[in-house]
């Protein structure tokens, strides 16, 4: 009696095969990769005429300060900029990708980019990777509908607020905003408040540090204030580098001439055997 086999189509849904594999490898002694701790303070607020973004300039590699003066405010469009926190490679790659898409859209339509367009592209990309792209963003810009400020989390969720903070120093920066922010801020008041919030993150968070970068976006204009404030300047007295106290200098070469010439003469006769 012949028995016919029927191919049963696989059931849909998430496959946990790799999870079982990871558990087996862990039981056999394989150490799973640990969570990567990153640090940054990025902020943004809406003022009377537009949007102001701010960021610190420290890039870390674990416990090491890899770069003291990096740029965390990324260009998206002439009227839109984006601050990035998280893994530097992810934030730069995501913002560059969306920036190129916005440029193609401007070429095709002949119109300025809208902030909501950049927001949609960013959140769709991050949501599709379920948080594995480590990019936490503060997006700000001014378009035909006015100023806009959004926060985008690595999993794809977003917020729309008059002021926002992200990164490991976000709590310290948010405390400054909640205490001093008010509607209708002038340009100078907004810049001062953003700089103060970034400094709060720099001095209260080990992952944030160095200088303060600020970007002011208004209708038809933008101003990027690179190294607007340096809360931790180098304190070297000499332009050549470190200065040492007297009698503790490091000498690479030292030539000391003798005070007088010494002549050695032989006295007596050699001993006989």
Swiss-Prot record:
Record bears the keyword Hydrolase: yes
Active-site residue list: 40
Keywords tagged on the record: Cytoplasm, Hydrolase, Nucleus, Protease, Proteasome, Threonine protease, Zymogen
GO MF, one example: threonine-type endopeptidase activity
Record-linked InterPro entries: Ntn_hydrolases_N (IPR029055), Pept_T1A_subB (IPR000243), Proteasome_bsu_CS (IPR016050), Proteasome_sua/b (IPR001353), Proteasome_suB-type (IPR023333)
CDD domains according to UniProt: proteasome_beta_type_7
Main location as per UniProt: cytoplasm
Propeptide: 1-37
Swiss-Prot/TrEMBL GO biological process terms: proteolysis involved in protein catabolic process
Annotated EC: 3.4.25.1
The protein's enzyme class: hydrolase
GO CC aspect terms: cytosol; nucleus; proteasome complex; proteasome core complex, beta-subunit complex
Catalytic activity of the protein: Cleavage of peptide bonds with very broad specificity
Function summary: The proteasome is a multicatalytic proteinase complex which is characterized by its ability to cleave peptides with Arg, Phe, Tyr, Leu, and Glu adjacent to the leaving group at neutral or slightly basic pH. The proteasome has an ATP-dependent proteolytic activity.
Oligomeric form and interacting partners: Component of the 20S core complex of the 26S proteasome. The 26S proteasome is composed of a core protease (CP), known as the 20S proteasome, capped at one or both ends by the 19S regulatory particle (RP/PA700). The 20S proteasome core is composed of 28 subunits that are arranged in four stacked rings, resulting in a barrel-shaped structure. The two end rings are each formed by seven alpha subunits, and the two central rings are each formed by seven beta subunits. The catalytic chamber with the active sites is on the inside of the barrel.
Record family assignment: Belongs to the peptidase T1B family.
Protein name stated in the entry: Proteasome subunit beta type-7-A
Organism listed in the record: Arabidopsis thaliana
Lineage: Eukaryota, Viridiplantae, Streptophyta, Embryophyta, Tracheophyta
